[in-house]
Amino acid sequence: MAKSTVNKLSVSVRTNTGKGASRRARRDGKVPAVLYGHGEEPQHLELPAHAFSAVLRHVGTNAVLTLEVAGKEQLALTKAIDVHPIRHTIMHADLLVVRSGEKIVVEVPVEVEGDAGPDILVTQETTSIEIEAEALSIPEQLTMSIEGAEPGTQFTARQIPLPVGVTLVSDPEMLVVNVVNAPTDAQTKAKYAGEAHEAPEVGTAENKTAATESE
């Protein structure tokens, strides 16, 4: 993960809150946010939308930020973001106060790499796991290799290589990747033929009764 000093944002304190104030902030290119944690009073902030989005694109959703607030610096973890369903712009952010050297629990994506071989079907059952790591050493993602895996192989969370200082929080036996023989053409055709045979007739019993009575 990139160092927090790279993720430095100059932010302002929000004096007005509520939906109207949030809409105005977004029109001005700001993201309304709340900073909380460590027993401190929640602080309502406005983040520069373009710079904040750039950090999330390059570092990931577990980005640790260095916030410059009223002349002071504060480390914060991006805990949650609300994204507009159509425009895909960030509507709001929840930020968690963190301390240098502090260990925190976060969810990190898992990427599968490698080739299990021909005629093999690989299914990723879990796309992320929970880990504990120092706030400034959170990995952007974790990688699991399935190179040469044979049918019947199952990879669990405990088999994911973790960086030094990172510990697994998720269930070690949680299934991450399942490797099986790919179905043959004959099996696929038989499956679809069976599904077509089992498909119910169009129309409900009530409709058929009504049609019969109308005759």
UniProtKB/Swiss-Prot annotation:
It comes from the Bacteria. One of its GO terms (molecular function) is 5S rRNA binding. The keyword RNA-binding applies. It holds the Pfam family Ribosomal_L25p. Gene3D superfamilies: Ribosomal protein L25, beta domain, Ribosomal Protein L25, Chain P. GO terms for cellular component: cytosolic large ribosomal subunit. InterPro entries: Rbsml_bL25/Gln-tRNA_synth_N, Ribosomal_bL25/Gln-tRNA_synth, Ribosomal_bL25_b-dom, Ribosomal_bL25_C, Ribosomal_bL25_long, Ribosomal_L25_dom, Ribosomal_uL5_bac-type. Residues 1-19, 206-215 have a biased composition (Polar residues). Residues 1-29, 190-215 are annotated as: Disordered. One of its GO terms (biological process) is translation. Disulfide bonds: none annotated. Keywords: Ribonucleoprotein, Ribosomal protein, RNA-binding, rRNA-binding. This is one of the proteins that binds to the 5S RNA in the ribosome where it forms part of the central protuberance. HAMAP family: Ribosomal_bL25_CTC. NCBIfam families: bL25_bact_ctc, PRK05618.2-1. Belongs to the bacterial ribosomal protein bL25 family. CTC subfamily. Part of the 50S ribosomal subunit; part of the 5S rRNA/L5/L18/L25 subcomplex. Contacts the 5S rRNA. Binds to the 5S rRNA independently of L5 and L18. This is Large ribosomal subunit protein bL25. It comes from Mycobacterium leprae (strain TN). The gene is rplY.
